[in-house]
Amino acid sequence: MEKPLVFLDTDVLISYLRGDLASVHLFDREILDRVCLAINAIVLQELLFLAEVRNHPEIVDRIQEKVTILDFDLVKLDQYWQNARDIRNILVHSNDVLILSSAANCDYLVTYDKKLKKASSYLYNSKPMVVTPEELLAQLESKV
């Protein structure tokens, strides 16, 4: 059985760096054996601008060892911009639309961002399921 593809938003990586238990648990070996974590270049860029990372650049290497870097889905991106004005009205930053385009074919988008979750409800497919780290861990636990 193929592992679920799990896209991590920047806020989840920030909570990981700050030691929040649910986000830290996502990087535990037992979870990594069950899912494939992913980010895109936008999330990586946002991560590089954090003070914690500037002071300790080796953190990025540790994260990159555990995630897959996804490309942008340009077809999805074009659909979102053309057909989903509601998304543009909800999201403050165009980076979020780029994040949605990369996460479009993932099974889960893990975020604490309520606006991103609301914007994803305007998408035309059932993927990804937008959850918090706690919700993802609970779902994985229920599938054991």
Give the ranges of each region predicted by the language model:
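Metal-dependent nucleic-acid phosphoesterase active-site entry motif
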Residues: 1-22, 39
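Acidic, PIN/NYN-like endoribonuclease modules and their adjacent C-terminal/linker elements
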Residues: 1-3, 110, 114-144
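PIN/NYN-family metal-dependent endoribonuclease catalytic core
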Residues: 8, 24-54, 69-72
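A generic structural signal for short hydrophobic patches within well-formed alpha-helices
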Residues: 13-14, 44-47, 116-117, 136-137
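Short, flexible loop segments at the rims of nucleotide/cofactor-binding pockets, characterized by
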Residues: 13-18, 48, 85-92
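Short acidic-hydrophobic, aromatic-tinged amphipathic segments that line or gate anion-handling sites
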Residues: 69-75, 129-133
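Active-site neighborhoods of divalent-metal-dependent phosphate/nucleic-acid chemistry enzymes
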Residues: 71-122
